[in-house]
């Protein structure tokens, strides 16, 4: 299927690993001009080189910036003033008991996971409306619907992203601009894979055994019964970014492996 993304300018934040990297690679495969972002120039170079190696026709540029700050967001907008597609993917997570989540933790998670997308959307959405075409996607999580007790601060930010995406979509009424959120389920990103591997080692079991036990005990509602691969999420995001997805607007698109049981 041709997703009609040839020549579209796309910024994927937090691009150097996991879901963000997979999205950037998929958009590059579809012919989009992709802007790669991370906090350090070294990681941007590494990600760009890897995508170029895997996608022969990739058209990439990199912008290192810390999007957890207003200054970092301003830097990106200054270096890339025009976008067709904005994928707000950058994010952090950390399992932590509620009693031990400090004020600084709450503020950091909100700054990185929520305000990065707010600031960039505020910068790019007006011009998208003026040109009567654009795509903004927030990479939220099933944790935004089913708040994990072990990561309440993380779940809060994912719920906020869903709300912001819906609210921004309401402002695009009658235009060809769409704003959506995509809700991955448990995904085998590098960070999650390392986390799972460490826990499996601590519990003296294989990674495969731990994965089985994880879905049995921690995510029993999963229909998929395995970790989702980053490229599977990227496939969904690429379609949502496509002109073919013009009827999808204000939606919380689930790619959660069936973890969320509710229909609505």
Predicted feature locations:
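Alpha-helical segment proximal to the catalytic Tyr-Lys
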Residues: 126, 170-171, 246
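Short C-terminal tail/terminal secondary-structure segment
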Residues: 146, 237-238, 244, 249-264
């Amino acid at each position: 299927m041709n997703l009609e993304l040839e020549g579209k300018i796309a910024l994927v934040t937090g691009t150097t690993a996991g879901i963000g990297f997979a999205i950037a690679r998929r958009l590059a495969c579809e012919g989009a001009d992709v802007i790669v972002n991370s906090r350090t120039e070294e990681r941007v170079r590494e990600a760009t080189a890897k995508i170029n190696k895997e996608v022969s026709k990739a058209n990439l540029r990199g912008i290192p910036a810390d999007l957890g700050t207003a200054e970092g967001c301003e830097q990106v907008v200054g270096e890339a003033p025009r976008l067709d597609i904005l994928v707000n993917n950058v994010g952090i997570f950390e399992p932590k008991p509620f009693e031990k989540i400090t004020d600084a933790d709450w503020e950091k998670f909100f700054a990185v996971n929520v305000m990065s997308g707010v600031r960039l959307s505020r910068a790019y959405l007006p011009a998208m409306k003026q040109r009567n075409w654009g795509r903004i996607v927030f990479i939220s999580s099933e944790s935004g619907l089913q708040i994990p007790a072990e990561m309440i601060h993380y779940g809060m930010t994912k719920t906020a992203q869903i709300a912001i995406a819906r609210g921004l979509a309401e402002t695009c009424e009658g235009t060809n601009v769409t704003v959506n959120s995509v809700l991955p389920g448990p995904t085998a990103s590098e960070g999650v894979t390392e986390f799972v591997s460490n826990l499996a080692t601590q519990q003296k079991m294989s990674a495969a055994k731990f994965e089985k036990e994880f879905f049995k005990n921690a995510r029993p509602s999963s229909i998929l019964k395995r970790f989702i691969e980053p490229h599977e999420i990227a496939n969904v995001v690429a379609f949502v970014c496509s002109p073919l997805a013009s009827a999808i607007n204000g939606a919380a698109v689930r790619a959660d492996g069936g973890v969320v049981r509710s229909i609505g």
